[in-house]
Amino acid sequence: MDNKEIIQEVIKAFDNSDVETILRHVTDDIVWEMRDDKGMVVRGKENLLNFFSEYNEMKMVGTTKDHIIVDVDQVAVDGIVKMKGKDAVPFEMYYCDIYELKEGKISKMISYVNKKL
């Protein structure tokens, strides 16, 4: 599986809330930086699992993938994500995710998100 295929599988797993598949594709020392108004950073596979458990009330409704750009061990994806929060009110966000891979696993994710007005 090449890096683009790995990221496409991970994106599909995010779309389907398939945490097991996501965790299978990340390193034990994964770092996920969310560069939004909260500025959250998740470090390590165990903390990533805890993050997904904590935010399980957020449901993915749909996404677009406008671009998938691959440069050796870095992959960038952008588009629009449609979600429902714990209040069940739908909302949309623009996103750009940058993935860094080492030996076929994601070692770092940087997510830029901005709520669509």
Region locations from a protein language model:
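A beta-strand edge to alpha-helix "cap/lid" segment located at domain peripheries
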Residues: 2, 15, 33, 39, ...
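Short, well-ordered alpha-helical segments enriched in acidic and aromatic residues
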Residues: 16-33
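Short aromatic/basic micro-patch
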Residues: 42
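Solvent-exposed, amphipathic alpha-helical segments
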Residues: 6-13
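Outer-membrane beta-barrel domain signature
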Residues: 26, 38-39
